[in-house]
Regions:
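Short linear S-[DN]-x-LW-Φ motif typified by the pepsin-like aspartic protease active-site region
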Residues: 1-32, 36-50, 58-62, 178
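Extended, compositionally simple hydrophobic/Ser/Thr-rich segments
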Residues: 39-40, 46-178
Length: 178
């Protein structure tokens, strides 16, 4: 969904069994951004999202699947996902993208490596394995076990009452219950 002169420059292809969405429009500096470009994807299951963009990703409904891997590389938008998972892998590798997660997850593996926000305080997870190498803070909700590693100035804030908490601190950041 986009303006009539824009829609033709939005390309969708499948490469190596992956859906790739590209905006090939030029002269973007003269465009009117009052009407955003929206791409709607309806699929029964998804197992990986590779994000390298300036746009936003939002799940309109709860995404229910066994496992999901989300990798953000060089993006600067906002990712909002409502999830029902057994295993979740969430990696904020580069850029300033913000990741906001909600729902339920059995085991969550998370890594923040750059300036973006990793906010999973609304994702109720049984076990969380998280590493923060960022200057930004991370937020998680954990019920059973937390394994947290700090490698920079960013903190890891957790809510819930995990029975087992393991921390490795190699930087000025802290692991803080809130």
């Amino acid at each position: 969904e986009a303006g009539k002169n824009i829609i033709g420059g939005i390309e969708t292809t499948v490469e190596n069994r992956q859906l790739v969405i590209r905006n090939t429009n030029s002269c973007n500096w003269v465009r009117n951004y009052n009407k955003p470009i929206n791409v709607y994807i309806y699929i029964p299951k998804i197992w990986k999202i590779f994000y390298k963009s300036s746009g936003n990703i939002t799940s309109l409904n709860t995404m229910k699947t066994d496992s999901l891997k989300l990798e953000a590389w060089g993006g600067c938008g906002r990712i909002e996902l409502d999830l029902d998972l057994h295993n979740g892998f969430f990696y904020l590798q580069q850029g300033t993208a913000d990741i906001h997660l909600s729902g339920n997850c059995g085991v969550a593996s998370m890594h923040s490596n750059d300036f973006g926000l990793l906010d999973a305080r609304n994702l109720q997870s049984g076990y969380v394995f998280i590493s923060n190498k960022s200057s930004n803070d991370c937020y998680v909700h954990v019920k059973q076990g937390l394994n947290a590693t700090i490698q920079s100035i960013g903190n890891i804030y957790y809510t819930g009452n995990p029975k087992d908490i393991q921390t490795t601190i190699n930087g000025p950041g802290s692991v803080i219950h809130f």
